[in-house]
């Protein structure tokens, strides 16, 4: 038990150290090979995040931007952190599976409670011909990643969810925070117009940081 606790502390310290070392500005960059991205800090139990999610998915589809999701757990949400840890587990199985799990949780959010979260997760896993182990985070490393992501958000002064930025790989085009969700597509087009022409267009993907 003592060894397991020490291991968990070490993993958490390493994850938090990585988050602090990277600095908040590194989170506001698109993944390698992409010119633009939507960076979102979200909580899986947040109703506003659930409302915004289809719009983010549509933006990825329509504009070819990457979507970088960050965990930002709201402390008074009883099942949110565990759902984020589950999502991290599915990321390990397949990044697309993790993405689909997040969309699934958002789509069914109003029916999910702390007591039935596991049932919903098992239902998702079964529908995708996989299984969620009884102990899906035995060493605490996934929990540490979720908590480290939340630290990154705090360092960026994230106070509410979802917090969304349109970011680019150009130093001349600074990140733009979306304050009115209705203007997301308009903002993407405006930011895209500021980028210099490039030979290859970005591939449509969802990414984890």
Q: What does each model-identified segment do?
A:
Residues 32-46, 67:
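Short active-site neighborhood of thiol/selenol oxidoreductases, capturing the structured segment around
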Residues 7-17:
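Bacterial N-terminal signal peptides
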Residues 1-5:
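Positively charged n-region of N-terminal signal peptides that target proteins for export
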Residues 22-36:
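A short beta-strand-turn-helix
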Residues 44, 50-125:
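Structural alpha/beta surface segment adjacent to cysteine/selenocysteine redox centers
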Residues 31-33, 60-62, 79, 155-160:
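Extracellular/periplasmic catalytic domains that process cell-envelope and extracellular macromolecules
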Residues 122-209:
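C-terminal cap of thioredoxin/glutaredoxin-like
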Residues 42, 53, 71, 168-170, ...:
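A mature extracytoplasmic/lumenal domain signature
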